Amino acid sequence: MAISPRDEQNRSVDLWFAYKVPKLTKDADSDSASGYEYVYYDRQVGAVQKSPNLMNDPKGALFYTLDSVFGDPGDTTGWILYNDEMPADANRSNNATLGHTKGVIAFDIASSSALWLLHSWPKYASPSVPGVPTPLYGQTFLCLSLDLATAGKLAAQMALHQQPQVYLPRTGGLDHTSPLYALTQPLNASAPGDSDSLDFKTRGGVPFKVIAKNRKWGKDFWNDLVGPTLKADMYVETWIRGKIPPVLDSDGVHKTYDIKFIDLRKLGAPWAWPETQDHAKWGITTTDNWVCVGDINRMVTQEKRGGGTIAFQDPKLWKALCETDLIIPPPGKTDAQARAMIRKTHEPAE
């Protein structure tokens, strides 16, 4: 069977993006939320929209996509699941030396098709245990269609750089020389500490770039790699629970600022929350329409973990994440005051 992302109506689609809302209590800035509501985007829809579905319902893009893979797999269908916090049915302990990475690569050898779901949700996904994990925090999801050869190239990059913690793989008859098969085997702990940028296209021809680093690289991923690779300043939303790298990167040119408040109300979704309730890992450049969806945080401790992000130029999604005030001031503050607050988080007083 052909493998591809599925949209909100269970139709094959080239790519989609979703942003899950955290569990929220109603206040002056936001409606309450169960933690399973989300906004959704694909290029056919053409705009970021509030989904009528919930992520813990048996419908919607995330459910339909994984159900099409796990529900009734053929003999030549397989998958590679990876997460730095594995679900309980993986039945083994997490290895903190492996990558801070989360996702699913699914493939079908007979149809030479594949998909890649990169997300930020711990303990997800499981092929045998239905349901979804904690609703507490905001999470991001990006799902792309691939051909089998491209999936193999991405797997080869992962083995050297992101070094994901793989669990419950199904090889689907892969040749043992395949990079996909190699990713299901123990990884090379002596791989050199470096970074990488790999260009690829979806089956629909949309160009993407995977930017990744090995745990031995020893620098801040967002500040010293993503910004310089894209040649732009960035605003980044990640999980921050520790010391943060400086704004200015090592080349002394590009800056990375941390988002402090997220508001979906201008997208027609009645929710807003501070970054302390968000576990997503995404960023946007200040110019050139670059959107990044990844799985590694902007903290000093993450310099010792492998990880990556998928970067792509999408003016509509970029505009939704930027110009519609997802990066907005807390209540009572202007945009200028909000950006000053973000800068003050990192830059010492003069």
UniProtKB/Swiss-Prot annotation:
Molecular function in Gene Ontology: deoxyribonuclease II activity
Alphabetically sorted, this entry's keywords are:
Endonuclease, Hydrolase, Nuclease
Which EC number(s) does UniProt give?
3.1.-.-
Work out whether the entry's keyword set contains Protein biosynthesis: no
Question: Does Chaperone count among this protein's keywords?
Answer: no
Q: Which domain of life is it from?
A: Bacteria
Alphabetized InterPro entries for the sequence? DNase_II
Q: What else is known?
A: Unlike their eukaryotic orthologs the putative Burkholderia deoxyribonuclease-2 are probably not secreted from the cell, as they do not have a signal sequence.
Family, per entry: Belongs to the DNase II family.
Q: Please report the name of this protein according to its UniProt entry.
A: Putative deoxyribonuclease-2
Organism encoding this protein = Burkholderia thailandensis (strain ATCC 700388 / DSM 13276 / CCUG 48851 / CIP 106301 / E264)
